[in-house]
UniProtKB/Swiss-Prot annotation:
It is an enzyme of class 4 (lyase). Involved in coproporphyrin-dependent heme b biosynthesis. Catalyzes the insertion of ferrous iron into coproporphyrin III to form Fe-coproporphyrin III. Fe(2+) binds at residues 194, 282. It catalyses: Fe-coproporphyrin III + 2 H(+) = coproporphyrin III + Fe(2+). It holds the Pfam family Ferrochelatase. This is Coproporphyrin III ferrochelatase. It comes from Corynebacterium efficiens (strain DSM 44549 / YS-314 / AJ 12310 / JCM 11189 / NBRC 100395). One of its GO terms (biological process) is heme biosynthetic process.
Length: 377
């Protein structure tokens, strides 16, 4: 199966695949899901138990699949409103419905030239290239079982799309309005996204525009703040794991809140999870549980900004991205950093971009060390 570039695509696509990370939908699914996520990484069982406790706290259910289904329903409605008559499929890397199963169904249904919307706004390995690898895996699976070939064209990164920025800015303003009136003027806006190891940060992008993920997060945050009419803000990180000896992007959101409170007497924060399009586990545990608990102990008030994924405006943006491909429209964007991500059949955006850093097996490092068990989605 030969990969192609977007310049050689056909003029019409016959399906859309929403490709995501996956999450358990019951207690019995938690451990198998985590084993899928960590397969081949040598993660100690006790680390899986620790992360599993986060899911069990919510009944063993991640909200991610439900929220993705909301996105799909909204996208279907927007497609119909614009006169598109194409089916929408759903597949995950790590849990049901699996991406290979979605690819099988697409091939059986006669789909031959599909678009792929990955539920990540960003560049970088976890935010972009890993989805290209998923596409390569789906095509290899179809070839292995003798199914008809399906061509997959991934839609581009959208961290600075006007609809994404405007909707997030609207949600930021609404969060400020929810604060007690006497705290609004002094409240600080803090953007947060999933941390990554510094060696992965340096590998994101190509040799010319490295660290693309962290730079896109910073630019997106600045665009949202400006649209919301806010001059001063912070960009921080969350959900780090792994050995404490491995440096990750900092500061951590909880550490930052504590520092603002202790050093500046900060009493109120508006926290915007810009790195996440939906309220999945990193949002509802790390922010709505851990951060809120620390804030309560300190007498701080925190308003957590809503995520954009379930909104009608987000679905409109997804179909805008489809329009760009179908009609060869000039892309809509507000930022200045490179925007890539759209290739055919899982080809990297440019040779060598966003290369994964090889993780040593747990037995080769600290046998009691944590290891990453989550990815941006």
């Amino acid at each position: 199966m030969n990969a192609r570039t977007p310049d050689t695509k056909s003029d019409s696509y016959d399906a859309l695949l929403v490709l995501s990370f996956g999450g358990p939908e019951g207690p019995e699914e938690v451990r198998p899901f985590l084993e899928n996520v960590t397969r081949g990484r040598g993660i100690p069982p006790e680390r899986l138990d620790e992360v599993g406790a986060h899911y069990y706290h919510f009944g063993g259910v991640s909200p991610l699949n439900r929220l993705n289904k909301e996105i799909i329903a909204n996208v279907k409605a927007e497609l119909a409103a614009r006169g598109y008559d194409i089916p929408v499929y759903f597949g995950n890397r790590n849990w049901k419905p699996f991406d290979n199963e979605a690819a099988e169904q697409m091939a059986a249904d006669g789909i031959r030239n599909a678009l792929v919307f990955a539920t990540s706004a960003w560049g970088g390995y976890s935010g972009c290239r890993q989805y290209h690898e998923d596409i390569q895996g789906m095509r290899a699976h179809l070839e292995e079982i003798g199914a008809p070939e399906v061509t997959f064209t991934k839609l581009r990164q959208f961290y600075d799309h006007p609809r994404f920025v405007r909707t997030m800015a609207q949600y930021v303003r609404e969060s400020f309005d929810k604060l007690p009136e006497d705290l609004r003027d002094e409240a600080r806006l803090v953007f947060t996204a999933h941390s990554i190891p510094l060696n992965s940060k340096d590998a994101d992008g190509n040799p010319i525009d490295g660290s693309i993920y962290s730079r896109q997060v910073e630019e997106s945050s600045a665009l949202i703040a400006r649209e919301a009419g806010i001059d001063d803000f912070d960009v921080v990180w969350q959900s780090r794991s792994g050995s404490p000896h491995v440096p990750w992007l900092e500061p951590d959101i909880v550490d930052h809140a504590v520092e603002l409170n202790e050093n500046n007497g900060q009493k109120a924060l508006v926290v915007c999870p810009v790195g996440f399009i939906s309220d999945h586990m990193e949002v509802i545990w790390d922010l709505d549980s851990e951060l809120m608990d620390e804030a309560t102990r300190r007498g701080m008030v925190i308003e957590r900004v809503a995520t954009v994924g379930p909104s009608d405006e987000f679905a409109t943006m997804v179909v805008d991205l489809i329009d760009e491909m179908e009609m060869k429209r000039v892309i809509e964007r507000l930022g200045t950093l490179p925007v890539r991500g759209s290739t055919v059949n899982g080809e990297p955006c440019v040779p060598g971009c966003c290369a994964p850093r090889r993780r040593p097996a747990a037995s080769q490092t600290n046998p009691n060390a944590d290891a990453p068990v989550a990815s941006r989605s």
